[in-house]
């Protein structure tokens, strides 16, 4: 019992108890406390009831309060102006009209409360600040003194006295000292256990004496009577420290002897002995009582059913887990006596026993179970010598010649020639094992392998692997014409034997053949099974999915076979030709791509994209005349095709044939006068420096296509390039009248006004653009950046908040919002952005830049990879990725990013378009533009 807590605390007071009466205090009672007189025989006693329930007066008040629910309509409760103090109809029903009236009054109260709410809150805030300035907190008053606490040293801290009234505490709270004699059992116990010091004094000499630390002292030559050195004999105590040292020495000697002996090599590992001991310690978290219960239950099971093998195995494993390995061994050996025909018991006994003993256990098991394959395998595993393993397995095969597992284990230990001989015998003993037949075929010569596979087909006519292996054998020996026949015969034979042709399994086999290098076999398998089990209307879709799956599994020849078969079935489908062409472009050679495109344009001459891909392939290879000839053929098939005209113009302009490009554009304007043709004509003259011709062509184009915004943009940019700001503004304004929903036109006009210093006008233009084009992220982004460039960061943040409310799923806005925040809040903002736009490339790019700014290189590289994977057309992502690798990557990584960018050929991105569409960079390649954009990036984010 706690000495401080009294036993009567928390108990009800005895009857008639008066507080303080024991120390002389006198209480008094009144009539209201006593209450009315009561009979002496009345058992009820309310003198100690809670307040408010003790007297009759309290009960009367309670009854009166219960009656107060009724309306008090007395004249004393009536006022001429306000009427009755309470509601006259409080007891009436609360109807819908009353609810509407209350709602109206509540709305009025709320409206009145909101009036001047901001002024009231501002006034209250100022009053609170004024009050805190006049009456600061104690914490604020001592803040300057608290700073000086940093100068206090550790010694000064320790010298500060404890807080408390220590004047006469002992006199006020006297505590009697208790003395208890030490029992004799205490001394006897410590005398028996040899209690003594276990620490060694650093001054101790070799024989136990102490070196006197002072110059004038003497070195004690011999140990004293009870010094930490050699213990004085005759004391009757034991030195436990020396006993432990002797035991460790003895253990080292035994381990050394064991490590030197050959027979103990597999029994004890001296270096790992302590590790083995630790592994024997039970690692479970169960209660010791649970172990005892389990032990009793298992004992009961063993006694009631001693011939039940799982009981013996479970008992042995329980003892093993608890660390009693020898008990476990004894139990399992007794289990082998009770269950000599149980394979599991013998295997468990062999597992628990050490090396040589385990061999003896297995030998005994073989005598009881001479047909057990698992015991023979365990016996072979226990042998360390290869010859001994072979001897065990051959002995096993004498007893169990039809075990495939034993044959496989024996063959794995043999040399190729001996293995071939053993497999010849194995297929005789196990004629239904496909693995043994195939292994024998792989070890035989070509002619013998064919004979082996023929015998295998006779013995196992329902297995497809034998047929596929035969096809691979013919392909490996150059008989590719036999591959197709073998696969066709396989399908026919398997169906004749009642085997269902599983299309997915055959496709997996074809992929394995592809990975093994058997191209002809995989293609033959694909052609044979690709159309099995598919509805006619689902063929195209299913085959395209199969091709994509093969590409994902890196089985390119299988995918090529699928495309070839699909093109035979659908020779006029442009989409199939395109998929096959893109496959060859990404995974094939230039020659295979061009050959495929030649076949494609022969079957689909109206497919412009196929002609253009062929011309581009020739042009990239440097064969410009071949590209021209392809485009000429394309003109014949598509005489008024805008795409082919523009491709021809680009081909000539890229090869500096400007006059030929002009003539082509002139012909195109006469035969196919489209807006894009006019735009390319204007741009050609513009980049060549013929500004007058460009302006004339632009005016002519606008007369025909005044609703084409890019023409108005080019007109304004040409004027802006010549420093003719008024004419540029007029061009943009005219363009916006014709194309009010063109975001780039609004941006160009706004930036023009900002460039000449008209910030207010630029802001007004953007506000007007947002009214005409609501929920436009590009316009909101430009508005935010305009304020940010002007130094008005608060207004920029406010606009960004409004923009995110209007366009909550805009990735470009969220990416900008991340870097508008202060550094500590950027990570939180990026999490919000990812929740809203998980797969937006701008948000992924912002996260990559965020990790880059925090110098988390690995994570930044991972997020850059995600960005370019999800949208390879975003040039800004490639530029930032390349800049990142320039600073933190190797030359190989930089080159990889550049090559991937060139293959992706990005066309979009704010920074990318600013460089790629610059007139001075019109002839630059993708790789050069990438370098220029990366050079413009300054990682100040």
Curated annotation (Swiss-Prot):
PROSITE patterns for this protein: TPR_REGION
UniProt organism field: Rattus norvegicus
Disulfide bonds: none
Modified residues (Phosphoserine): 143, 279
Coiled coil: none
Post-translation changes: Phosphorylated by PRP4K during spliceosome assembly.
Keywords per UniProt: mRNA processing, mRNA splicing, Nucleus, Phosphoprotein, Repeat, Spliceosome
Protein name, entry field: Pre-mRNA-processing factor 6
Phosphothreonine, modified sites: 180, 266, 275
Amino acid composition bias (Acidic residues), ranges on this chain: 66-78
Disordered: annotated segments: 1-79
UniProt cross-references to InterPro entries, sorted A to Z: HAT, PRP1_N, Syf1-like, TPR-like_helical_dom_sf, TPR_rpt
HAT repeats: 384-416, 418-444, 445-476, 554-586, 588-620, 622-654, 689-721, 723-755, 855-887
UniProt KW Signal keyword: no
GO biological process, one term: spliceosomal tri-snRNP complex assembly
Compositional bias of kind Basic and acidic residues: 39-65
Subunit field text: Identified in the spliceosome B complex. Identified in the spliceosome C complex. Associates with the U5 snRNP particle. Component of the U4/U6-U5 tri-snRNP complex composed of the U4, U6 and U5 snRNAs and at least PRPF3, PRPF4, PRPF6, PRPF8, PRPF31, SNRNP200, TXNL4A, SNRNP40, DDX23, CD2BP2, PPIH, SNU13, EFTUD2, SART1 and USP39, LSm proteins LSm2-8 and Sm proteins. Interacts with ARAF1. Interacts with AR and NR3C1, but not ESR1, independently of the presence of hormones. Interacts with USH1G.
Gene Ontology terms: cellular component: catalytic step 2 spliceosome; nuclear speck; nucleus; U2-type precatalytic spliceosome; U4/U6 x U5 tri-snRNP complex; U5 snRNP
Record-level Gene Ontology MF annotations: identical protein binding; protein-macromolecule adaptor activity; ribonucleoprotein complex binding; RNA binding
Job description of the protein: Involved in pre-mRNA splicing as component of the U4/U6-U5 tri-snRNP complex, one of the building blocks of the spliceosome. Enhances dihydrotestosterone-induced transactivation activity of AR, as well as dexamethasone-induced transactivation activity of NR3C1, but does not affect estrogen-induced transactivation.
Location(s), subcellular: Nucleus, Nucleoplasm; Nucleus speckle
């Amino acid at each position: 019992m706690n000495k401080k807590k009294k036993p009567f605390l928390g108990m009800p007071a005895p009857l008639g108890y008066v507080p303080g009466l024991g120390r002389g205090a006198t209480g008094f009672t009144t009539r209201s406390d006593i209450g009315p007189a009561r009979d002496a025989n009345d058992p009820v006693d309310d003198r100690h009831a809670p307040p408010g329930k003790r007297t009759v007066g309290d009960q009367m008040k309670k009854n009166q309060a219960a009656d107060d629910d009724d309306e008090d309509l007395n004249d004393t409760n009536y006022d001429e102006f306000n009427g009755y103090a309470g509601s006259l109809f409080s007891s009436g029903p609360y109807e819908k009209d009353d609810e509407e009236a209350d709602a109206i009054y509540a709305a009025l109260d709320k409206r009145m409360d909101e009036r001047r709410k901001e002024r009231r809150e501002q006034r209250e805030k100022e009053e609170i600040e004024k009050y805190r300035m006049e009456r600061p907190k104690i914490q604020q008053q001592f803040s300057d003194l608290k700073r000086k606490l940093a100068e206090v040293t550790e010694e000064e801290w320790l010298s500060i006295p404890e807080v408390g009234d220590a004047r006469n505490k002992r006199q006020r709270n006297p505590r009697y000292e208790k003395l208890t004699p030490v029992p004799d059992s205490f001394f006897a116990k410590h005398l028996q256990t040899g209690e003594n010091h276990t620490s060694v004094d650093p001054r101790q000499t070799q024989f136990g004496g102490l070196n006197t630390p002072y110059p004038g002292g003497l070195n004690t030559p011999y140990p004293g009577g009870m010094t930490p050195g050699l213990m004085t004999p005759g004391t009757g105590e034991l030195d436990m420290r020396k006993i432990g040292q002797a035991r460790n020495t003895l253990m080292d000697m035994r381990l050394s002897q064991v490590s030197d002996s050959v027979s103990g090599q597999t029994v004890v590992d001296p270096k790992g002995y302590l590790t083995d001991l630790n592994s024997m310690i039970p690692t479970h978290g169960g209660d010791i009582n649970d172990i005892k219960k389990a032990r009793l239950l298992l004992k009961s099971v063993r006694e009631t059913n001693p011939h039940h093998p799982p009981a013996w195995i479970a008992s042995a494993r329980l003892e093993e887990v608890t660390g009693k390995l020898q008990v476990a061994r004894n139990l399992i050996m007794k289990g082998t006596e009770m269950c000599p025909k149980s394979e599991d018991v013998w295997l468990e006994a062999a597992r628990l026993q050490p090396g040589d003993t385990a061999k003896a256990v297995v030998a005994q098991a073989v005598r009881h179970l001479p047909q057990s394959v698992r015991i023979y395998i365990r016996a072979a595993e226990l042998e360390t010598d290869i010859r001994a393993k072979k001897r065990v397995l051959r002995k096993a095969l004498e007893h169990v010649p039809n075990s495939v597992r034993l044959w496989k284990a024996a063959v794995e230990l043999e040399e190729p020639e001996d293995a071939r001989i053993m497999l010849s015998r194995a297929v005789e003993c196990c004629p239904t094992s496909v693995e043994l037949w195939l292994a024998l075929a792989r070890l035989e010569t070509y002619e013998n392998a064919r004979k082996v596979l023929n015998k295998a087909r006779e013995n196992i006519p329902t297995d497809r692997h034998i047929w596929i292996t035969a096809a691979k054998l013919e392909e490996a020996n150059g008989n590719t014409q036999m591959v197709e026949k073998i696969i066709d015969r396989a399908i026919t034979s398997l169906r004749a034997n009642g085997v269902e042709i599983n299309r997915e399994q055959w496709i997996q086999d074809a992929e394995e053949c592809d990975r093994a290098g058997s191209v002809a076999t995989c293609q033959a398998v694909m052609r044979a099974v690709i159309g099995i089990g598919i509805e006619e209307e689902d063929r195209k879709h299913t085959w395209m999915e199969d091709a994509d799956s093969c590409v994902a599994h890196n089985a390119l020849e299988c995918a090529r076979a699928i495309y070839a078969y699909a093109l035979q079935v659908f020779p006029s489908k442009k989409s199939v030709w395109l998929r096959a062409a893109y496959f060859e472009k990404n995974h094939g050679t230039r020659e295979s791509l061009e050959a495929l495109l030649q076949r494609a344009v022969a079957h689909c001459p109206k497919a412009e994209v196929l002609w253009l891909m062929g011309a581009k392939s020739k042009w990239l290879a440097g064969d410009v005349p071949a590209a021209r000839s392809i485009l000429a053929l394309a003109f014949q098939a598509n005489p008024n095709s805008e795409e082919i005209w523009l491709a021809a113009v680009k081909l000539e302009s890229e090869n500096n044939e400007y006059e030929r490009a002009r003539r082509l554009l002139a012909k195109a304007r006469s035969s196919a006068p489209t807006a894009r043709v006019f735009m390319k004509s204007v741009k050609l003259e513009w980049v060549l420096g013929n500004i007058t011709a460009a302006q004339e062509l632009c005016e002519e184009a606008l007369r025909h296509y005044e609703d084409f915004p890019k023409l108005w943009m080019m007109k304004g940019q040409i004027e802006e390039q010549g420093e003719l700001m008024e004419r540029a503004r007029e061009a943009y304004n005219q363009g916006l009248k014709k194309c009010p929903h063109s975001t780039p036109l609004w941006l160009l006009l706004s930036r023009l006004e900002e460039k000449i210093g008209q910030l207010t006008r630029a802001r007004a233009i953007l506000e007007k653009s947002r009214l005409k084009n609501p929920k436009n992220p590009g316009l909101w982004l430009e508005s935010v950046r305009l304020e940010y460039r002007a130094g008005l960061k608060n207004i920029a943040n406010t606009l960004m908040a409004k923009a995110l409310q209007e366009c909550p799923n805009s990735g470009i806005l969220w990416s900008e919002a991340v870097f508008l925040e202060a550094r500590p809040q950027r990570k939180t903002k990026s999490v919000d952005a990812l929740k809203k736009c998980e797969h937006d490339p701008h948000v992924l790019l912002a996260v990559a830049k965020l990790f880059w700014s925090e110098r988390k290189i690995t994570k930044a590289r991972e997020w850059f990879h995600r960005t370019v994977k999800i949208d390879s057309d975003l040039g800004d992502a490639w530029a930032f990725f390349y800049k990142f690798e320039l600073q933190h990557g190797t030359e190989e990584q930089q080159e990889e990013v550049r090559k991937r960018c060139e293959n992706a050929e990005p066309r979009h991105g704010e920074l990318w378009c600013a460089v790629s569409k610059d007139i001075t960079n019109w002839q630059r390649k993708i790789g050069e533009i990438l370098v220029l954009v990366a050079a413009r990036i300054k990682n100040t984010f």
